[in-house]
Amino acid sequence: MDFDSPLFFCITRKTTIMETMNATIKTLVYNLVILDKSGSMESIRKEAVDGYNETLGTIRTAQLKHIDTQEHFVSLAAFCGCGVEMIYDKTPIKDAENLTQDRYVPCCMTPLYDAIGITIQQLKKDIAHAEDTAVSVTIITDGYENASKEWKGDAIKNLIEDCKKDGWMFAFVGAGEDILKVASTISITNTVLWDKTEEGTRIMFSVAGKANERFYDKIAAPCCTEASIADRKKMRRQFAEECYDALTE
């Protein structure tokens, strides 16, 4: 090719412009926590609130660290047999105040599938037209599905698998010994076994926080931020499976 030709100049200029555009598109990072609010959570109510506030702190730190490439939002869905309460709903992290015990009051049963299906389906719909998004979903429960009316396990599995194609990161935090089996039925491979004590709850939120930090760092790397939107999604699919694995190596 003639490097002095107008054609070469146009191709080079187009490539440079596209690279610049990709590098300047901020990733909108949605952090969704689906938190059990059934009656059995009352014994660790304070620890759950404190742990979630630590999660907010982790996200605030990530926003400052990656201010040029990421914009963080938080959603907290607290669920029990009374329904799903969106305590935060795609709230910019700069506007998210700490959770208080007055806002998180455990009671009644565990409609786990309804909580997952309702919140994920709505978030998926809300961000469908955003140019570049990354999503982290953490599901925390000390019990088992026992009260859902709208969603079944197979439908939840299909929904999660569909979201994972877009690079969503999912984690299932459970107190039962058969957590791996429960998580696998809905296609979640990232799991944290939760010792439901004061110290165990602190450790659980810390583990989830570190995994999210790794995810934020990976999607902020130049290899990702300078890639096309399609390639970013491909990278996130890989990152979503690596971030929890790294904590057990």
Spans of model-derived segments:
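Acidic, low-complexity intrinsically disordered regions
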Residues: 5-249
